[in-house]
């Protein structure tokens, strides 16, 4: 009996193969995206760094230079280095104490907000004693005697401690070398003077109103109004004469000449005489707070 082919079984097998091959292969999964690397947290300033920054801010001083024609201010550090822009406005004329305080408060407000100074130094164009004004010849008002200007300004500026001396004395603090007798002459709206011995400020000498020539005081002889009237050439001769008078009067080891008109000097200065930048009126404010005492 001839053997029968298992056609049914083979057909079903072929059908199974076709069925399997007809199925699509499963789609390959895309590799999982790596999570972005986390940035390490920013390091906080160390306690020592924070204290150093606080000390730096605590050393900041608002230095104010009151002149007969301009009010100037800047923030300085304990070494007298300027740490802010220098701001300036014209001095009001006539200028009462209240007008001056108002003008200064407006002038320095941006510096206070941005730099947070801890103290205030003031150079004033007149005789100052114990933070009070005794004379203010270039401010055009007679109501200045005994005015507690430092306290008035402190009251307007949040109670910050304030020290105030004559403006020529502030310039001298920035310029002096601290050896021997050093004298300061400032040439601006008027003539200012200051005397130092071994770096220490001596009692104030107000030579500006002392007669020097034909009944004219220093202010009237070499002040800015006198320069404008006489011309720079004659004015230079007058300043040269004053240097000789001061040498005989004070017998200084060094004479420093400051103020806005010091830049107008054209003659050769003696070896022991030097001109200083007008910025000294700001920079010297730092030494008002140095531990070394200053005599009234």
Stretches with model-predicted labels:
Residues 70, 246-278:
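Glycine-rich phosphate-binding loops at beta-strand->alpha-helix junctions
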Residues 2-53:
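Low-complexity, polybasic segments enriched for Lys interleaved with small residues
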Residues 71-75, 126, 173, 191-197:
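Short beta-strand scaffold segments in enzyme catalytic cores
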Residues 61-65, 119-121, 182-186, 256:
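Short glycine-aspartate micro-motif
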Residues 149-171, 201-238:
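Glycine-rich phosphate-binding loop plus the immediately following alpha-helix
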Residues 85-109, 113-121, 127-181, 221, ...:
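Glycine-rich phosphate-binding loop and adjoining helix at the ATP-binding site
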Residues 56-102, 133-135, 200-229:
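Short glycine-rich, Thr/Ser-proximal phosphate-binding strand/loop in the N-terminal lobe
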Residues 180-212:
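Anionic-ligand binding region
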């Amino acid at each position: 009996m001839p053997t029968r082919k298992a056609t049914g079984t083979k057909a079903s097998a072929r059908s199974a193969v076709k069925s399997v091959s007809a199925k699509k292969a499963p789609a390959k999964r895309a590799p999982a995206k790596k999570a972005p690397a986390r940035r390490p947290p920013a390091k906080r300033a160390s306690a020592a760094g924070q204290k150093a920054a606080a000390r730096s801010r605590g050393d900041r001083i608002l230095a104010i230079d009151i002149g007969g024609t301009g009010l100037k201010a800047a923030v300085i550090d304990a070494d007298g280095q300027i740490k802010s822009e220098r701001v300036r406005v014209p001095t009001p004329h006539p200028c009462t104490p209240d007008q001056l305080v108002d003008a200064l408060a407006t002038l320095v407000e941006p510096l206070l907000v941005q730099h947070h100074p801890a103290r205030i130094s003031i150079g004033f164009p007149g005789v100052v004693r114990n933070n009070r004004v005794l004379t203010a010849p270039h401010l055009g008002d007679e109501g200045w005697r005994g005015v507690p200007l430092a306290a008035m300004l402190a009251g307007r500026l949040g109670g910050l401690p304030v020290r105030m001396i004559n403006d020529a004395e502030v310039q001298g603090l920035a310029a002096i070398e601290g050896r021997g007798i050093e004298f300061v002459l400032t040439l601006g709206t008027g003539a200012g003077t200051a005397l130092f011995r071994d770096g220490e400020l001596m009692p104030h000498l107000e030579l500006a109103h002392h007669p020097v020539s034909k009944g004219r005081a220093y202010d009237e002889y070499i002040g800015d109004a006198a320069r404008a009237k006489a011309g720079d050439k004659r004015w230079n001769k007058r300043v040269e004469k004053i240097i000789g008078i001061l040498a005989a009067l004070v017998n200084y080891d060094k004479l420093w000449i400051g103020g806005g008109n010091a830049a107008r000097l054209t003659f050769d200065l003696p070896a022991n005489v030097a001109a200083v930048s007008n910025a000294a009126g700001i920079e010297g404010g730092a030494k008002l707070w140095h531990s070394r005492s200053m005599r009234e």
